[in-house]
Regions:
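Alpha-helical transmembrane segments and their membrane-interface boundaries
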Residues: 1-231, 235-245
Length: 245
């Protein structure tokens, strides 16, 4: 309510980040991890708004830049699958764009969320010893690394999917990006299984959405996205995460 019904996606984004940052780390010193969180939220504030102000081709390059930075800042520890939170947040904010006063409220909500995430992250990770620093995230970028090739692959696949959707004049291009992101895994052998589950549970999710749409009063429609976000955050397996997405 503080940020308005148009910004319910901010609550989803912050909630997912909190759920991840309770346990996940960035593979660098904890205090430097706070810089990563600041960078991530800075991208979430500026990137989606900027890409929506541009035509499809320039927006593609903005998306490439922002998603690549999110990968570098938040996904150094591949096993944590942090991209499924931070890139997802970027895509949701990009798809549910706002302007004017609503955007100012969005910025305030994301800044408040950033502070909450920093506090939780520092409290839970402050005693973990790490040798890597914030700058090492950039120094260690090397295209001969499987991790960094995955960064590039996911960035261009997601951005290209949204570009194609935009050029075709189709709404909510971010859904194509989310679909591609969810099956573009760091371990290639896992991709096929993900693709099969996504098809089936997309149908399940659609049926759940229809049920909620029919059952809930119209005043609750803006919060269906938040309900889905909570479902994603508490789903242990990919199949049900897909359904709630």
């Amino acid at each position: 309510k503080l940020t308005g019904s148009e910004n319910s996606v901010v609550g989803v984004t912050v909630l997912l980040a909190v759920l991840v940052l309770r346990q996940a780390d960035f593979g660098i010193k904890t205090t430097h991890g706070l810089l990563s969180i600041a960078g991530i939220f800075g991208i979430l504030i500026a990137g989606p708004r900027l890409s929506n102000m541009l035509s499809p081709i320039p927006a593609f390059f903005v998306n490439v830049f922002c998603i690549m930075l999110l990968m570098i800042l938040g996904c150094h520890n591949v096993i944590m699958y942090n991209h499924s939170t931070f890139v997802l947040g970027y895509l949701l904010l990009q798809g549910y764009d706002v302007s004017g006063h609503a955007y100012l409220l969005r910025v305030e909500g994301l800044l408040a969320g950033m502070v909450i995430c920093m506090a939780i992250f520092y409290k839970n990770q402050k005693n973990r010893p790490y040798r890597r620093t914030f700058l090492d995230l950039f120094r260690e970028f090397d295209l001969s690394s499987a991790r960094n090739r995955w960064y590039v692959k996911l960035t261009f696949i997601v951005s290209s999917a949204m570009l194609v959707m935009s050029l075709l004049g189709l709404p909510r291009a971010m859904w194509a990006g989310i679909a591609c992101m969810s099956v573009c895994l760091p371990f290639t052998d896992d991709c096929m299984g993900r693709a099969e589950k996504r098809g089936l549970f997309n149908i399940v999710g659609s049926l759940v959405f229809v049920a909620l749409y029919l059952i809930l009063p119209e005043s609750m429609y803006p919060y269906i996205g938040m309900i889905g976000g909570i479902g994603v955050g508490y789903s242990a397996g990919y199949a049900w995460q897909t359904a709630f997405n």
